[in-house]
């Protein structure tokens, strides 16, 4: 704001007509702003609030007589219709024991006859079968695997633990100051219409200096951007080079069965190393396989199955369902089918354990753990360990899947945390016959002792008739065959072919090339998709298709068809060296689900340790699992996901490329999606990370800290309390509390470069701590949160913990522990509040607290209220934040934290609280000062409401505050959502800039706010802010603080943008804004 305008606002002339003349121009500007806002309301389909302009000068309202209109108009008063919804009842977010394990009632016995039959077929006995399997099968395949060529890995640099921000250059300053920015020389005309007039009397030299400074600043920023782009380009080139080397290494591997078929290697994915973490952090964290609590050696080999717990892993739908080929074995006319795996643990699973992980994996199956009896003679730990190594490591090559606890040194003997046993069962008359582990060993021994076809069999089949060849090879069709000479060692044999001239029989495997191995056309496809999307956006903006649209679309479809056919691959390999495993493709899905279930079980055992640390037991672990899930975490199979994909592709049921279930892809970006989400008209999906809980936990932690500081530091003003609270709730302190609770050992996040940086990891820990506090709040209320925060903060300092936990009563309550309502009948000041209590339906035990809430700062200190209401207002703000956050979290389960923050801001804003103050008539009960006091401003009314909430919290507790806020505040949310008043000016401007962006631009231009100048003394600062879009100034404004100035300049810029947009769109019949308005009208009519 200029000096001339400041003087105008401070020196009011006495003559009434002179006042009208001086404020006539301001009224015209204000009316113009209202007209611009009407355009915005029309765009948002809001009812018009404008009135007819005055006919004469006398009808212009004086500034003191006109009400200060809110940016989007006053919210309407509540009616009975607004209370048709019960705001005190919430949908459940947690449920007690919702995941209780199922116990099977099946009668399970050992299949004795099957064991005798398999021992005869394997030419062994029950006492020798383990040794025979180890020597004939396991050692044979291992010896053959050792002959594979040892090709060194491509060395990738480790991720850096240092900050990613580049150091500032000498002489350069990244911050925006008044000397760094100045007025643009080419937009002075725009400024006259959209902002306050500039000081035209400034010296010409100053203007020249400002322009020169701005040019230097722009040049410096351009140089910094170029240097950053160059660094990013060089780093990208290095990564691409390493990626190509890694792919070429796999393609040219001497033992690769085919250059285009990917295979598994320990610690290596399809595109490079799975772990690029620095050495200091390789020995910790879930992503490296370190589970909390797995620090004790376990040996159950000599316990004869004592203290073991048996669970059957049921996979639904059954992988062999509706499949012609499945894993089974016929013995004496009885068919034993492969049912899956049994998981044997050394401790019972927690009662409150979730049935499945919270994260979603890209498999079409789900698993369920069923507690089921197993005969003692069916299970042997050593047998299961051998079977695990053979099935998971040698056949399916899940080389990074380990069940042995990593906290224990390698030279210490210990059992795996979970024993895995294959299940072959035959059900008859509700009686289940189960193969013992030794029967399974005999089965694999009999199958893998010799090759699929001997040389004599090959010669015979080459000379046989085609029908005989088909019959003899059909029994091996869709079998998983193994040859550890190759990579991958196990493939699915889709069918067999022969070459009569060469006397060879071939295994035929239909494969799908990995994306990283595929055609060269992928970059072209990506480019065409991007180009096509830009053309579609241009059509939405202009209503006219690009002339090259059809050509680009046809080329894209053609390349996609070629790429789809190029990914199909037929592999022919001679049968020599291949052995039959006795398994069919249905086992692949069971293997993946078993790996996932093992991680889930071990993680829940770790949560037992976490519950012991915080001394709290959750009723439902879904909420704590979600709290410990970082936003970077997608899915976890307990092993690298590339290994799982390769195994399913090579060994699972064949699925034609392109026939996968196509998920519906919805456009989630854009202004219309945001409006639809806030209205609840777009379908939502569960948000599978902890950011929603972190949003709620932030309010929980703030209230806990505010509560303790308020009652501990009784003589500190609100400014000092706010400083202490900021220090306690900052990320650095919360990250320390998270480590004290061992959250760093429980947090699930992606195995990449995101959280390698120490500062970023501490930030994630702080957010996780807040999410955990929210989870405890939802599960058990506010009291356990207070206890756990206290222990995390001062658990190792008993003296400080005692001081923190010792909460004194409020001084007014200490004076009258039984209540002071008797004083209200003899004190006129207190008796006036009976009417307010009757109006609200709330009766205070200590009515002096209620009087203190209505005692403003200008009231002298007295024995009745013992001070003013500023401390209560500070406490009430935290109470209001928590209760509103809790309401939004429960009522909007599909809203992201950003959406809920917008709604909360609209509910707890000063404007809303001022309306609440007027609706409840709080101003009538303000204790008057002995001298004349001015009328309450908007901020004063808001402080009055917060002080009342603080007094209610101190006197009656959190539940009374919850009832008051939900009844008084929450019904207004419907109005904010329907009228879209949650969208403040800065957010609205950003959405407009995104909507008006150039489709050909790689990155959308965002509005940029710059500080043009700071004027005035320290106690009366005036900040001048300008907003720029694509380098051009849209508006500038001056206010008493930066936040107000940015909001004001955003409003002015919106008015200018809307007028420009509508005048431009007037020349176009099918404009983007008309489409948006039509869509909004359709949504409203629907």
Swiss-Prot record:
Knockout mutant characteristics: Sterility.
Note on cofactor: Each RNase III domain binds at least one Mg(2+) or Mn(2+) ion.
Compositionally biased residues, Basic residues: 13-23, 159-168
InterPro entries given in the database record: dsRBD_dom (IPR014720), RNase_III (IPR011907), RNase_III_dom (IPR000999), RNAse_III_DSRM__animal (IPR044442), RNase_III_sf (IPR036389)
Cofactor: Mg(2+); Mn(2+)
Domain spans labelled DRBM: 984-1059
Compositionally biased residues, Polar residues: 43-53, 191-201
GO CC, alphabetical: microprocessor complex; nucleus
Localization per Swiss-Prot or TrEMBL: Nucleus
Gene3D superfamilies in UniProt: 3.30.160.20, Ribonuclease III domain
Every RNase III domain range: 607-781, 833-957
UniProt biased composition (Acidic residues): 181-190
Biased composition (Basic and acidic residues): 24-35, 203-217
Binding site for Mg(2+) 2: 873, 943, 946
Annotated site location: Important for activity: 939
UniProt GO molecular function: metal ion binding; ribonuclease III activity; RNA binding
Pfam families per the UniProt record, alphabetical: dsrm, Ribonucleas_3_3, Ribonuclease_3
Binding sites annotated in the UniProt record for Mg(2+) 1: 694, 767, 770
Enzyme class: hydrolase
Regions annotated as coiled coil: none
EC number per UniProt: 3.1.26.3
Keywords: Developmental protein, Differentiation, Endonuclease, Gonadal differentiation, Hydrolase, Magnesium, Manganese, Metal-binding, Nuclease, Nucleus, Repeat, Ribosome biogenesis, RNA-binding, rRNA processing
Record function comment: Executes the initial step of microRNA (miRNA) processing in the nucleus, that is the cleavage of pri-miRNA to release pre-miRNA. Involved in pre-rRNA processing. Cleaves double-strand RNA and does not cleave single-strand RNA. Involved in fertility. Required for the function or synthesis of the let-7 miRNA.
Family under the similarity heading: Belongs to the ribonuclease III family.
Protein name, UniProt field: Ribonuclease 3
Source organism per UniProt: Caenorhabditis elegans
Lineage: Eukaryota, Metazoa, Ecdysozoa, Nematoda, Chromadorea
Gene field: drsh-1
